Amino acid sequence: MKKNVIIIGAAGRDFHNFNTYFRGNKDYNVVAFTAEQIPGIDDRLYPKELAGKDLYPNGIRIYPESKLPELIKKFKVDECVFAYSDKPYSYVMGISAIVNAAGANFVLMGPKDTMVKSKKPVIAVGATRTGCGKSQTSRRIIEYLVGMGLKVVAVRHPMPYDPDLNKQTIQRFAEVADLKKQNCTIEEMEEYEPHVVTKRNVIYAGVDYEAILKGGMTKDPQTGK
Protein backbone atom coordinates (compact mmCIF):
# COMPACT_ATOMS: atom_id res chain seq x y z
CA MET A 1 0.00 0.00 0.00
CA LYS A 2 1.36 3.41 -0.95
CA LYS A 3 2.40 5.83 1.76
CA ASN A 4 1.25 9.42 1.49
CA VAL A 5 4.11 11.87 2.00
CA ILE A 6 4.58 15.61 2.50
CA ILE A 7 8.06 17.06 1.92
CA ILE A 8 8.82 20.06 4.13
CA GLY A 9 11.36 22.40 2.56
CA ALA A 10 12.45 25.70 1.08
CA ALA A 11 12.68 25.07 -2.68
CA GLY A 12 16.04 23.31 -2.68
CA ARG A 13 16.81 20.16 -0.72
CA ASP A 14 13.12 19.26 -0.75
CA PHE A 15 13.07 19.10 -4.55
CA HIS A 16 16.38 17.22 -4.53
CA ASN A 17 15.09 14.58 -2.10
CA PHE A 18 12.01 14.13 -4.25
CA ASN A 19 14.02 13.84 -7.48
CA THR A 20 16.49 11.30 -6.12
CA TYR A 21 14.20 9.11 -4.00
CA PHE A 22 10.48 9.68 -4.54
CA ARG A 23 10.21 10.45 -8.26
CA GLY A 24 9.23 7.23 -9.99
CA ASN A 25 8.96 5.40 -6.63
CA LYS A 26 5.60 3.60 -6.72
CA ASP A 27 5.71 2.86 -2.99
CA TYR A 28 5.06 6.52 -2.17
CA ASN A 29 2.61 9.23 -3.14
CA VAL A 30 3.96 12.73 -2.49
CA VAL A 31 0.78 14.73 -1.93
CA ALA A 32 2.38 18.12 -1.27
CA PHE A 33 5.46 20.21 -0.66
CA THR A 34 5.48 22.88 2.02
CA ALA A 35 7.81 25.86 1.71
CA GLU A 36 9.55 28.52 3.75
CA GLN A 37 12.32 31.11 3.11
CA ILE A 38 11.70 31.70 -0.64
CA PRO A 39 9.24 34.60 -1.23
CA GLY A 40 6.22 33.58 -3.29
CA ILE A 41 7.19 29.91 -3.53
CA ASP A 42 4.11 28.67 -1.68
CA ASP A 43 0.85 28.16 -3.58
CA ARG A 44 2.86 27.26 -6.68
CA LEU A 45 3.30 23.97 -8.48
CA TYR A 46 6.17 21.53 -8.83
CA PRO A 47 5.44 20.80 -12.50
CA LYS A 48 4.59 17.41 -13.95
CA GLU A 49 7.62 17.62 -16.25
CA LEU A 50 9.88 17.55 -13.18
CA ALA A 51 7.67 15.43 -10.92
CA GLY A 52 7.14 12.67 -13.49
CA LYS A 53 4.09 12.66 -15.75
CA ASP A 54 3.17 9.02 -15.07
CA LEU A 55 2.78 9.26 -11.29
CA TYR A 56 2.12 13.00 -11.04
CA PRO A 57 0.23 14.07 -14.19
CA ASN A 58 -0.97 17.25 -12.46
CA GLY A 59 2.32 18.10 -10.75
CA ILE A 60 2.60 18.58 -6.97
CA ARG A 61 1.19 21.61 -5.17
CA ILE A 62 3.43 23.71 -2.91
CA TYR A 63 1.76 25.05 0.26
CA PRO A 64 2.85 27.36 3.09
CA GLU A 65 4.49 25.47 5.94
CA SER A 66 1.96 27.01 8.33
CA LYS A 67 -0.72 24.74 6.81
CA LEU A 68 1.17 21.55 7.69
CA PRO A 69 -1.21 20.19 10.39
CA GLU A 70 -4.32 20.61 8.24
CA LEU A 71 -2.55 19.14 5.19
CA ILE A 72 -1.59 16.03 7.17
CA LYS A 73 -5.23 15.44 8.07
CA LYS A 74 -6.62 16.41 4.65
CA PHE A 75 -4.35 14.06 2.70
CA LYS A 76 -4.16 11.29 5.34
CA VAL A 77 -0.38 11.65 5.40
CA ASP A 78 1.82 8.82 6.70
CA GLU A 79 5.22 10.54 6.63
CA CYS A 80 6.56 14.09 6.59
CA VAL A 81 10.13 14.49 5.32
CA PHE A 82 12.00 17.53 6.66
CA ALA A 83 14.32 18.71 3.89
CA TYR A 84 15.95 22.08 4.45
CA SER A 85 18.75 23.52 6.55
CA ASP A 86 19.55 26.82 8.27
CA LYS A 87 17.27 25.91 11.18
CA PRO A 88 18.30 25.20 14.79
CA TYR A 89 17.66 21.88 16.49
CA SER A 90 14.81 23.39 18.49
CA TYR A 91 12.98 24.40 15.30
CA VAL A 92 13.44 21.01 13.63
CA MET A 93 12.21 19.16 16.70
CA GLY A 94 9.34 21.62 17.00
CA ILE A 95 8.20 20.68 13.50
CA SER A 96 8.65 17.03 14.46
CA ALA A 97 6.27 17.52 17.39
CA ILE A 98 3.69 19.20 15.14
CA VAL A 99 3.92 16.34 12.64
CA ASN A 100 3.64 13.63 15.30
CA ALA A 101 0.73 15.39 17.01
CA ALA A 102 -1.11 15.46 13.68
CA GLY A 103 -0.62 11.69 13.35
CA ALA A 104 2.28 11.30 10.89
CA ASN A 105 5.87 10.06 11.14
CA PHE A 106 8.68 12.62 11.01
CA VAL A 107 11.58 11.68 8.70
CA LEU A 108 15.09 13.00 8.04
CA MET A 109 16.62 11.36 4.97
CA GLY A 110 20.24 10.23 4.88
CA PRO A 111 22.93 10.31 2.18
CA LYS A 112 22.43 6.75 0.88
CA ASP A 113 19.03 7.66 -0.53
CA THR A 114 19.77 11.20 -1.69
CA MET A 115 23.35 11.50 -2.97
CA VAL A 116 24.02 11.51 -6.72
CA LYS A 117 27.11 10.23 -8.51
CA SER A 118 29.38 12.47 -10.55
CA LYS A 119 31.79 11.43 -13.29
CA LYS A 120 34.02 14.32 -12.24
CA PRO A 121 35.93 14.84 -8.97
CA VAL A 122 33.90 16.95 -6.53
CA ILE A 123 34.87 19.31 -3.72
CA ALA A 124 31.85 20.11 -1.55
CA VAL A 125 31.60 23.39 0.33
CA GLY A 126 28.94 23.46 3.04
CA ALA A 127 28.08 25.43 6.15
CA THR A 128 25.63 25.45 9.02
CA ARG A 129 23.70 28.48 7.80
CA THR A 130 23.37 31.25 5.23
CA GLY A 131 26.07 33.92 5.29
CA CYS A 132 28.97 31.79 6.53
CA GLY A 133 31.06 32.39 3.39
CA LYS A 134 30.42 29.37 1.17
CA SER A 135 30.47 31.44 -2.01
CA GLN A 136 33.72 33.24 -1.20
CA THR A 137 35.35 29.97 -0.15
CA SER A 138 34.20 28.27 -3.36
CA ARG A 139 35.63 31.04 -5.53
CA ARG A 140 38.97 30.83 -3.72
CA ILE A 141 39.10 27.06 -4.22
CA ILE A 142 38.31 27.52 -7.92
CA GLU A 143 41.09 30.11 -8.20
CA TYR A 144 43.54 27.68 -6.62
CA LEU A 145 42.54 24.75 -8.85
CA VAL A 146 42.63 26.86 -12.03
CA GLY A 147 46.13 27.91 -10.99
CA MET A 148 47.04 24.23 -11.05
CA GLY A 149 45.91 24.04 -14.67
CA LEU A 150 42.63 22.23 -13.99
CA LYS A 151 39.25 22.85 -15.63
CA VAL A 152 36.75 23.79 -12.94
CA VAL A 153 33.08 24.73 -12.75
CA ALA A 154 30.81 25.49 -9.81
CA VAL A 155 27.44 23.89 -9.12
CA ARG A 156 25.22 25.90 -6.82
CA HIS A 157 22.05 25.35 -4.84
CA PRO A 158 19.22 26.78 -6.99
CA MET A 159 17.33 29.97 -6.20
CA PRO A 160 14.03 29.08 -7.86
CA TYR A 161 12.30 32.45 -7.98
CA ASP A 162 10.87 31.93 -11.48
CA PRO A 163 7.20 30.83 -11.26
CA ASP A 164 7.90 28.27 -14.01
CA LEU A 165 10.34 25.81 -12.45
CA ASN A 166 10.75 24.05 -15.80
CA LYS A 167 12.92 26.98 -16.87
CA GLN A 168 15.27 26.29 -13.97
CA THR A 169 15.90 22.56 -14.40
CA ILE A 170 19.45 23.19 -15.65
CA GLN A 171 20.99 26.67 -15.68
CA ARG A 172 24.43 27.51 -17.05
CA PHE A 173 26.07 30.89 -16.56
CA ALA A 174 29.24 31.62 -18.53
CA GLU A 175 28.82 35.31 -19.36
CA VAL A 176 26.80 38.33 -18.25
CA ALA A 177 24.30 37.82 -21.09
CA ASP A 178 23.30 34.50 -19.50
CA LEU A 179 22.13 36.32 -16.37
CA LYS A 180 19.71 38.39 -18.44
CA LYS A 181 18.61 35.41 -20.51
CA GLN A 182 17.68 33.50 -17.35
CA ASN A 183 15.78 36.51 -15.91
CA CYS A 184 17.91 36.49 -12.77
CA THR A 185 16.82 38.43 -9.70
CA ILE A 186 19.20 40.86 -8.00
CA GLU A 187 20.03 38.19 -5.39
CA GLU A 188 20.88 35.67 -8.10
CA MET A 189 23.01 38.19 -9.98
CA GLU A 190 24.95 39.00 -6.80
CA GLU A 191 25.76 35.30 -6.52
CA TYR A 192 26.58 34.49 -10.14
CA GLU A 193 28.31 37.68 -11.34
CA PRO A 194 31.56 37.17 -9.37
CA HIS A 195 32.01 33.82 -11.12
CA VAL A 196 31.36 34.94 -14.69
CA VAL A 197 32.75 38.49 -14.48
CA THR A 198 35.59 38.48 -11.96
CA LYS A 199 36.75 34.85 -12.16
CA ARG A 200 35.75 34.13 -15.77
CA ASN A 201 34.35 30.86 -14.51
CA VAL A 202 31.27 28.82 -15.43
CA ILE A 203 28.64 28.19 -12.77
CA TYR A 204 25.74 25.74 -13.00
CA ALA A 205 22.54 25.87 -10.97
CA GLY A 206 19.10 24.32 -11.25
CA VAL A 207 16.32 22.37 -9.62
CA ASP A 208 17.61 18.95 -10.73
CA TYR A 209 21.21 18.28 -9.60
CA GLU A 210 21.20 14.82 -11.15
CA ALA A 211 20.24 16.27 -14.53
CA ILE A 212 23.09 18.77 -14.21
CA LEU A 213 25.66 16.12 -13.36
CA LYS A 214 24.44 13.59 -15.94
CA GLY A 215 23.39 15.84 -18.78
CA GLY A 216 24.70 19.32 -18.16
CA MET A 217 28.32 18.24 -17.84
CA THR A 218 28.61 15.16 -20.03
CA LYS A 219 31.23 16.79 -22.26
CA ASP A 220 33.33 19.86 -21.56
CA PRO A 221 31.67 21.68 -18.62
CA GLN A 222 33.49 24.89 -19.45
CA THR A 223 32.21 25.13 -23.02
CA GLY A 224 29.02 23.11 -22.67
CA LYS A 225 29.86 21.27 -25.91
Regions found by a protein language model. Name each.
Residues E36-G59, P163-Q168:
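N-terminal beta-loop-helix "entrance" segment that forms/cooperates
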Residues K3-G24:
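Glycine-rich adenosine-cofactor-binding loop
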Residues Y28-G40, V155-R156:
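Short internal beta-strands
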